[in-house]
């Protein structure tokens, strides 16, 4: 199996606030509703994503996870609260500056990302829209093709791809602007176990290059394997957050299969690898 290609640019900004690195995302007291006369989807929600981490946001259907992602991306506006991206108020990013090297979003509706009759056409059109010259276009598209392992898909129509292949190609497209912050809505949807492992390698490679990722997911096993921090959105606010170890071991509903099976036997174990290791250690004691 080939190792994932390394991203070609390192993002490590040095802004400081009181000696601490500025968070990638700061959401403070945010409230949002779709209908003026309807109920709040987010209720005075506050949330922070540290620079350079992978944060997974979990919660039930309709809990507001995708809404929080869209607010972070500046696609919809809350009626109350403040959002900062890398220390700068969201409203202070003028024009399309937010989407040129600052952040990119992978939406849940993957097909909405594609506009061309082939992946290659789509990628090239987006490169031109970003103002790239011919040489840069070739370099950039080959970089994302190799990183996402989709060179063999470039001449295919997006509608002819499997769900997992569409995810990878859409992800490649949002990487073209070389964003510091990745907002990913269900990125492992439609992927088999092999493709998920490949995606995990890619995300860890991007993290190593300095990227930050906020990932909305229902896939607790994937979240446990990739996240630095997990957070639970419930009743319009962040109900719990922590490392995967503390988050999943303390949660009775949103937890891994390994954590559920081993509860009471190996408290605190949340991955299959941890349970296997503890089982072997116990056997060796007898």
Range-by-range predicted roles:
Residues 81-91, 99-100:
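Conserved ABC transporter NBD signature motif
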Residues 73:
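Helix-to-loop junction immediately C-terminal to a conserved catalytic motif
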Residues 1-26, 254-286:
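ABC ATPase nucleotide-binding domains
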Residues 1, 237-260:
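Conserved beta-strand-loop-alpha-helix hinge in the C-terminal portion
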Residues 157-161, 165:
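Conserved ABC ATPase signature
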Residues 124, 135-153:
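Conserved ABC ATPase "signature" region
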Residues 58-60:
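The feature captures the beta-strand-to-loop junction immediately N-terminal to the Walker
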């Amino acid at each position: 199996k080939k190792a994932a290609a390394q991203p070609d640019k390192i993002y490590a900004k040095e802004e400081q606030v009181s000696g601490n690195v500025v968070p990638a995302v700061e959401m403070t007291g945010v409230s949002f509703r779709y209908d003026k006369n309807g109920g709040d989807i987010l209720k005075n929600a506050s949330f922070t994503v540290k620079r350079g981490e992978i944060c997974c946001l979990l919660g039930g259907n309709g809990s507001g996870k995708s809404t929080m992602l869209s607010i972070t991306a500046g696609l919809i506006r809350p009626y109350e609260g403040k959002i900062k991206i890398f220390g700068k108020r969201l409203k202070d990013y003028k024009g399309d500056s937010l989407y040129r090297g600052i952040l990119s979003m992978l939406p849940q509706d993957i097909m909405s990302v594609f506009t061309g009759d082939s992946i290659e056409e789509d990628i090239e059109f987006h490169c031109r829209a970003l103002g790239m010259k011919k040489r840069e276009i070739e370099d950039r598209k080959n970089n994302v093709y190799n990183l996402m392992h989709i060179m063999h898909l470039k001449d295919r129509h997006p509608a002819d791809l499997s769900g997992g292949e569409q995810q990878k190609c859409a992800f490649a497209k949002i990487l073209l602007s070389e964003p510091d912050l990745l907002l990913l809505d269900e990125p492992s949807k439609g992927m088999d176990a092999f493709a998920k492992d490949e995606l995990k390698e890619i995300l860890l490679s991007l993290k190593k290059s300095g990227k930050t990722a906020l990932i909305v997911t229902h896939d607790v096993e994937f979240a446990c394997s990739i996240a630095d921090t997990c957070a639970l959105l419930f009743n319009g606010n962040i109900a719990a957050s922590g490392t995967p170890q503390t988050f999943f071991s303390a949660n009775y509903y949103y937890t891994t299969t390994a954590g559920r099976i081993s509860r009471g036997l190996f408290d605190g174990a949340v991955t299959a690898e941890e349970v296997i290791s503890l089982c072997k250690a116990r056997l060796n004691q007898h």
